[in-house]
Amino acid sequence: MTAPGPILVINPNSNEVVTSGLRDALGNYPPSPAIECVTLNDGPFGIQSQRDSDAVVLPLLSLIESRPDASAYIIACY
């Protein structure tokens, strides 16, 4: 049996500070499965409007399609 892929936690904006905060918040969980926090580099710096939300859809889908190794995807947006 193969090991499960990582849980991919996606920050849908391009603000690396937010992604760093996610890593810090999730860093105390057990190591398996791995939790990998990534930034959507093609996203807006912040998501403050419907236009910003709409702008992340295609880059987000592209990122997910490029990571079939992941066991799960979490879109970390509030």
What are these regions (language model features)?
Residues 54-78:
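Glycine/small-residue-rich loop that forms an oxyanion/phosphate-binding "nest" at active or ligand-binding sites
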